[in-house]
Amino acid sequence: MTNSIRIGTRKSPLALIHTNLVIQQIKQFFPDINCEIVPIITSGDLIQNKPLYDIGGKALFLKEIEQALLDKKIDLAVHSLKDVPGRIPEPLVIAAVLEREDPRDVFVCLKYKSIEELPQNAVIGSSAVRRKAFIQKIRPDLKVTVFRGNVDSRIKKLMTGEVDATILAYTGLKRLEVFNPEYCHLIEYSQMLPCIGQGVIAVEIRKDDNAMLEICNQINHLPTFELIKPERAFLEYLDANCRTPIAAYSQYLDANPRHLSKLAYREVFEGNTEALATAAYKSNRTDASTGLTYKLPLEVEFGKMYNIQTNFMLGNLDGSKITFHTETTNIKTSTEAGIKAAKMMLEAICK
């Protein structure tokens, strides 16, 4: 086992909070490992005056960090999963996630409590085409203007009257301790589905780095890991970018996800040495369709299979047409459910 880890991350206050949360998890299992934070400025951080869909999409928040991973300048990278494209460079893999926080969006406005209450032709600051599509579905009269920057800068722009309102992720507001119920109002899932992976902190490594894989297997939150599979499969199949209004949110239907633990994935190896070797080989592999590495449930010990319901949204490029779909599946077939939804909805949106 390694004695130290170089952890790559963006330099934003929220990214550093995420990184320290990952370090806390690592220290729980490996208290003697030294964790060095390596802040990296990404292209997405440098270019703030243009919408992401004009400059390369959310991958711009990962490009330099992933290159540092490939160049072995860092051992592990921390991302907001919502910024991770569906397709990851082949030598890399999302090997762990932390427990998902509340992924809902928040309507931030000094005078009004909801999108519906805004006056005619009010201005909402948002660069996300997903949010723009939902806003225009609810209130087609509203003007949605490009609104980039970190959480603090966006709130300052709101306070100075640059826009009438904005929409931000609850998780970021909470972790930065700037959620104020006086002007921050949660938006329910029924009104606005969250971004794929929103509320999830992801850990990316080189897939051949066994030391990092061992660490990731320990810190990985399996209930969240299972939930994001249909969301990520949906994203990967559509090869969606920042020009495509797309959303998905998964939740367990019949069980408390905290009950899904590593014990449920305990593997029992019996038989001759060849069988043992085969079982050991199968216990760690990459699911190519989602870019996730995980331990296969060779023996599931809980009494019933966990069921997952995922709500999907897909719009056309200009946001004038939006379609919704819901899939219910168990954890063994959740990836296939995401692909199935993508195929059906793509056909519907193209009609």
Curated annotation (Swiss-Prot):
Its EC number(s): 2.5.1.61
Additional information: The porphobilinogen subunits are added to the dipyrromethane group.
Description of how the protein assembles with itself and partners: Monomer.
GO biological process: protoporphyrinogen IX biosynthetic process
Keywords tagged on the record: Porphyrin biosynthesis, Transferase
Identification of the protein by name: Porphobilinogen deaminase
Pathway membership, UniProt: Porphyrin-containing compound metabolism; protoporphyrin-IX biosynthesis; coproporphyrinogen-III from 5-aminolevulinate: step 2/4
Molecular-function annotations in GO: hydroxymethylbilane synthase activity
Cofactor(s) the protein requires to work: dipyrromethane
SUPFAM superfamilies: Periplasmic binding protein-like II (SSF53850), Porphobilinogen deaminase (hydroxymethylbilane synthase), C-terminal domain (SSF54782)
